[in-house]
């Protein structure tokens, strides 16, 4: 086992503090509308330019192992805030830095670290409760656009695009961000339910110019088995032909004689028909077929349920206003499903998603919700160069997370104002002893840090502006972009409550652990021994001396 280096007390804490400050100083220059960029060197390709706090934090590794331990613990703050709300990483880092610095000063002055931590925790619980009281719902497009704009670094086009996407696909819809091919940002919206399965034969195509199949008011047959025998299909084909409507078959597979007969019937105009494979695999396929059944008010013909394809009737068929099938995708538009059944199915999938443990499962369940409840929107980010593209895509993703958080828990005044107000509201909070009271004061002081940093990055004097904002009331704050005081919500400077809450909670949690550190242990660096393997090589010419 390798030898260890052990440090105690102030010696350990001062090293840890140095690491915390190096990382926080690198991250906090990005905060606010006038925050600067950070350039990150990459082992291959061009450097990455970013204003995203967590991207900067992830790059920091320090040579001194004790300092690095401090930096890595602070990195956890940014990472946790990012996982919880998708934004607020820089705010969380600034809060944690302030709590650690002020807390360690108090420890050096003889305060009890455990009581300090209890005081900090008490202050945060009080502050979170007050934050929730200040929060206002964020439901209209205007406030969603404002949140998106602030998070995307005051880029109004991004905020507007996100608001437009949310309006079209709903709060449950899936919005993804991709790299575009042009200079302009674009929004593509797929309405209805779309899945990644195309037509099984090009002979089904009835729109040759678009190489697609379009079926108006079709019946939809859903089966979880392979269909290869046309005899099973004959009764339903005859019923559909009599009804004079087209038919879409979604099954595990349609092959051989069955597929050939369908193609011939379609080409002769006896019955307008198309067939596609069911989406997904295994249990997920069964679940998605059930989703389509509920969306179209149909029944999945499944032998597990005791249903037989030969005995199926038009009552078992689903229906939709329109279906469009391309080589790769099938889109069902305006299914005739019962709204209350769809919403209870959405609730059921949401519950499954909350209980799911893997991110992949959560993502797939969220996609199913989106396909049932709204649709899918794709924001295509445009930029002139690859470096700009990466930076902009990261900003758009941040803005998207922030708007989702805003819709979930509402918004509070931005620009660090909400934290100043809640710090003021817990001014009368008291702990069980004086050391806990100091902890409460440390947390309240830290709540001013984001505003002070935003002001410092804008080149103004933090103390003067912080005191003016503290003297104000409600949503009155300082707009660092325009350098004016006013109502932050009226000026469109909003922060999602969830982002502010997560930043405060994670900062206090990890900073509290750092304050209570008394000993740090790390591996001693291994000494490189000189390579002596070639030392005797020069003696070869002495062989004749004997």
From Swiss-Prot:
Localisation: Cytoplasm
GO molecular function: ATP binding; ATP-dependent protein folding chaperone; isomerase activity; unfolded protein binding
A Pfam family per the record: Cpn60_TCP1
Ranges of biased composition (kind: Gly residues): 535-546
Binding site for ATP: 30-33, 51, 87-91, 415, 479-481, 495
UniProt keyword Kinase, yes or no: no
Matching PANTHER family: 60 KDA HEAT SHOCK PROTEIN, MITOCHONDRIAL
Oligomeric and partner information: Forms a cylinder of 14 subunits composed of two heptameric rings stacked back-to-back. Interacts with the co-chaperonin GroES.
Family under the similarity heading: Belongs to the chaperonin (HSP60) family.
Name of the molecule in the record: Chaperonin GroEL
Organism, scientific name: Wigglesworthia glossinidia brevipalpis
UniProt gene name: groEL
